[in-house]
């Protein structure tokens, strides 16, 4: 396509006359030079309106028109490239490019109309478009809160400014009453939504809301649960403080002492001899085939006859489950008790004497005897060491001890939650429930329900009965075991 030739000086001359507001030249028309498809020439001009210009446009020609309008005392310019329906095809293809290129010579252009027939050139449509153009329409807005304003069009700049500066009070009078109703409805809707959010989460159905009786029942259940927890804590504390059950030689001796004495007359025991404790375990001595341990040396006997007996020290029980060194005094205490149960003639004589006389004035011999006894108890002899080795062999837990330990472990395990054989949680029905919808689980008060799913945030759980029925039920009708 050849470039457009606008070298004719009349083109710029007449364009200038139209833009300057010359009354004799309101519109101008340009066309191609005959036998040329790219050179433009001046065709005609006039002082009339758009109807006069339309007479210069026919179906078999191409024209470029430029017309001046006055809108609100302001000049507005319209560019109309015209291509009739009877124009040849090749010329139509070049026309679109020439129209765009020629529009650069018409400045300013407030509106452009690409016309193909007389119906495209409508004066009312062009005037409305110019009113909406920048700087031409002084309307403050065609719509206010959904209502359309009147068809008032300002005829001057002062009228446009007055319409644009109307007060808000006058604008509110135009608002439709339906808008007020919509505002009120939306406000009530949001109030209800906010009120529903503040309430605690409960099942969606209103007929399953908790009543005051159920609230009292749950409070009572919580109080009982707290009491049970306190009792369990107290029992655990007492079990920690109490020694574990054991079956040692010292415990057997204490059980025999605590039993009521039989009616049979007590028979005197023989005096303790060497290896008296070892005689209790003949099987172990035969297997080891070791010589008997040396016997405990006898305590020194004071020379004075009126010497009181040594004060009996309390016997403290040592737990079996601890290290063997704490079990060491058991044999020593047992042996000491045997000596105390069978007093010799000298000890009987000492016990017959009143002890109060000697307790008020302790002699030097008593102090010496007490110090020597402490040294003897602090330093274990070879016989005590042998007893310790013997005891370690027989400290293996018997069947009774294993049974006591297993029973104690079972008792110390806290009962947290009950599970069925499949590993699911269980719950107990507090009220009767008849399912109204498909998929609901019906049950009676006291039924045991296996809980399958608790993920519903609205409080509807899925469970099954022992009969095999499955379904959904409200969580506030059951108590988890």
Curated annotation (Swiss-Prot):
Domain SH3 span(s) in chain numbering: 422-481
Domain of life: Eukaryota
Any one Gene Ontology BP term: pseudopodium assembly
InterPro entries reported in the protein's UniProt record: ADF-H, ADF-H/Gelsolin-like_dom_sf, SH3-like_dom_sf, SH3_domain
Disordered as annotated region, ranges: 217-423
UniProt feature, compositional bias: Basic and acidic residues: 217-227
Record field: compositional bias (Low complexity): 228-237, 336-413
Cellular component terms per the entry's GO annotation: cell leading edge; cortical actin cytoskeleton; phagocytic cup lip; phagocytic vesicle; pseudopodium; site of polarized growth
Comp. bias regions, Acidic residues: 325-335
Biased composition (Polar residues): 248-261
Record SUPFAM superfamilies: Actin depolymerizing proteins, SH3-domain
UniProt domain ADF-H: residue ranges: 3-131
Cytoplasm among keywords: yes
Family, similarity comment: Belongs to the ABP1 family.
UniProt function note: Actin-binding adapter protein. Binds to F-actin but is not involved in actin polymerization, capping or bundling. Does not bind G-actin. Controls pseudopodium number and motility in early stages of chemotactic aggregation.
Cross-referenced PANTHER family: CORTACTIN AND DREBRIN, DREBRIN-LIKE PROTEIN
Name the record gives this protein: Drebrin-like protein
Gene from which the chain derives: abpE-1
